[in-house]
Structure formats: C-alpha cells, structure tokens
C-alpha cells in the first residue's frame, strides 16, 4: 500500500501572511492606492495572486489591466522578500520529518506560482525528500 500526504503551502505548512501582505501593499502603493494592515490580509488570501489583488483593490478600481499591472509589482517584490517574515507553523518541520522517517511520502500542491513554491520549500524544509512540489504554472489550469 502506497502512502502519501499532500499539503497546501500557505496557511498549512507556512505562515506567509505578512510577506503576502507586504507584497500586495507594495503593489497597491506602486499603483497609487491605499494599503491595508497585515491583520486584514487573512480575509483577502486563499485563491491565488489574482484574486488577492482583486480583493485588496477598491471595487471601483478593479479591472483586468490594473490587476495585471499589480501582479507584476507583486511578483517583483515578493520574489525578493518572500521569506522576510514567513515561517513554518510550530511543529511542521518535525511532522514532516516523522512522516518521511516512517516511509510516508510528502508533497506540496499550491496555487502560489511554481518558482516561489520551490524556493520556499527548499528554504524552510531543506532536508525533506519531497515526492512532488507543484505550484501554479503559466498555461496550466
């Protein structure tokens, strides 16, 4: 019998809300909009970058072109700062080590873009033999 546990990344393995909020606030600032306190971000996240950016914008300012421009600012900032405040939830590194030591494969499936998923997994869980690390890829639904 094969054994595998698949984890989401943000909000499951990693508490990344402060870095996501900082990147979204950077994008808002670059586009001339007011920012939000980090404490507001849990209600904005959960469905990928595009939805996050849509949710942080004032309703009257939401349009595909603006969201795409903000997405570029978000990725620029987040690419350099994705691990400034992010950290594993308590007990997660030990849990992953226990699972793999018992022969249970572990994987990550995230709606975060692929490069960021790989970076964060390798940065925070360097000794874990991941069966798969999958994030959002251009052209793949």
Name the predicted role of every residue range:
Residues 21, 25, 42, 46-54, ...:
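An amphipathic alpha-helix signature
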Residues 4, 107, 132:
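Hydrophobic "anchor" residues on beta-strands that sit immediately upstream
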Residues 55-94, 104:
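Metal-dependent phosphoesterase signature
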Residues 30-34, 59-65, 102, 125-129:
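Short helix-capping segments at alpha-helix termini
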Residues 30-60, 90:
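Alpha-helical substrate-recognition element adjacent to the catalytic core
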Residues 84-87, 113-141:
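Substrate-recognition "cap/lid" segment bordering the active-site pocket of phosphatases
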Residues 92-122, 136:
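Substrate-recognition element of Asp-dependent hydrolases with the DxDx(T/V) motif
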Residues 1-43:
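Active-site neighborhood of HAD-like aspartate-dependent phosphohydrolases
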């Amino acid at each position: 019998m094969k054994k595998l546990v698949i984890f989401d990344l943000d909000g499951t393995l990693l508490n990344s809300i402060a870095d996501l909020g900082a990147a979204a606030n950077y994008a808002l600032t670059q586009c001339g909009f007011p920012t939000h306190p980090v404490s507001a971000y849990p209600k904005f996240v959960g469905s990928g970058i595009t939805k996050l950016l849509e949710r942080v914008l004032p309703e009257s300012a939401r349009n595909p072109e603006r969201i795409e421009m903000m997405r570029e600012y978000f990725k620029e900032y987040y690419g350099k700062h994705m691990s400034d405040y992010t950290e594993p939830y308590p007990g997660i590194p030990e849990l992953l080590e226990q699972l793999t030591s018992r022969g249970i494969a572990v994987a990550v499936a995230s709606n975060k873009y692929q490069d960021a998923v790989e970076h964060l997994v390798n940065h925070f869980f360097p000794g874990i033999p991941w069966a798969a690390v999958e994030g959002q890829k251009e052209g793949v639904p």
